[in-house]
From Swiss-Prot:
Other information: Present with 1920 molecules/cell in log phase SD medium.
Compartments where located: Mitochondrion membrane
Identification of the protein by name: Uncharacterized mitochondrial membrane protein FMP10
Predominant subcellular localization, coarse grouping: mitochondrion
Protein's organism: Saccharomyces cerevisiae (strain ATCC 204508 / S288c) (Baker's yeast)
Lineage: Eukaryota, Fungi, Dikarya, Ascomycota, Saccharomycotina
Membrane topology of the entry: Multi-pass membrane protein
Alphabetically ordered keywords of this record: Membrane, Mitochondrion, Transmembrane, Transmembrane helix
GO CC term (a single one): mitochondrial membrane
Record-annotated membrane-spanning stretches: 29-49, 139-159
Family the entry assigns: Belongs to the FMP10 family.
């Protein structure tokens, strides 16, 4: 009798519920991740990409520079550049536009000079009283490392390019050979592709044939610093006969 009662009690406590395998919780974060990624991608495309920009990324680089599509794309970028508030701010602050020495950095003026890269020449402004130089560069989608973000090496190249231009303007000659002794880069925020960036050099100091200076790369509004840098260059006068 007691045996039957004990067996009944055991069956009561072992009715199968205890041994039931718990179902795996649904991964609700996956749909939200997909939604969030799609939303951010869509926002970026609407804010920073036009149909012309997409064409420049996919097919304009295969066309000659005098093709109608490429010429119109360059004209559109220059119109966008002229409409930036930073342009008027620089002019009001006493900066004057100067002609950049395109032969100084062939990587920027030649290799990267393509639709989707640095499609138009950078616009350079100089203020002799403040000894500051500002460059406006358009960085396209072909210069990305991670999706929609400009590669850090490209940013360093652009900063170094303007630093050399600043030294050339300070010395008053483009016939000068410059060597980068050291370049220190500090990345503060990611830089979105397909927008203009503002590069400004400051604190230029000369010690014989060496020049030290600082620079910062900002977004196209000029309000957010994305990269900071400082560098030392050595300079030697070139052949006077090559001076133009």
């Amino acid at each position: 009798m007691f045996k039957r009662i004990a067996i009944a009690q055991i069956r009561t406590y072992t009715n199968g519920v205890v041994f039931k395998t718990a179902s795996k919780p649904k991964r609700r974060w996956i749909p939200w991740t997909i939604f969030g990624g799609s939303f951010l991608g869509g926002w970026y495309l609407t804010q920073h990409m036009t149909f012309t920009d997409l064409l420049a990324y996919w097919r304009y680089d295969a066309l000659p520079k005098n093709a109608d599509e490429v010429v119109k794309y360059h004209a559109d970028l220059n119109r966008r550049l002229n409409g930036l508030p930073i342009v008027k701010q620089l002019e009001n602050a006493g900066f004057v536009q100067v002609i950049a020495n395109e032969e100084e950095n062939l990587l920027v003026s030649r290799a990267l000079n393509t639709p989707g890269g640095v499609a138009i020449p950078p616009r350079v402004y100089y203020n002799p009283s403040r000894r500051e130089t500002v460059g406006l560069y358009h960085l396209g989608m072909k210069l990305t490392g991670y999706p929609f973000l400009i590669h850090g090496g490209i940013l360093a190249t652009v900063i170094e390019d303007l630093m050399k231009e600043a030294i050339r303007l300070e010395k008053g000659t483009k016939n000068i050979n410059q060597e980068t002794k050291n370049l220190s880069i500090s990345y503060k925020f990611p830089t979105l592709a397909n927008q203009f960036v503002v590069v400004r050099t400051t604190d230029l100091q000369q010690y014989g044939n060496k020049t030290k200076l600082k620079a910062e790369l900002m977004d196209q509004s000029g309000n957010r610093t994305l990269v900071k840098a400082n560098a030392t260059f050595s300079s030697e006068q070139g052949n006077p006969k090559e001076e133009k």
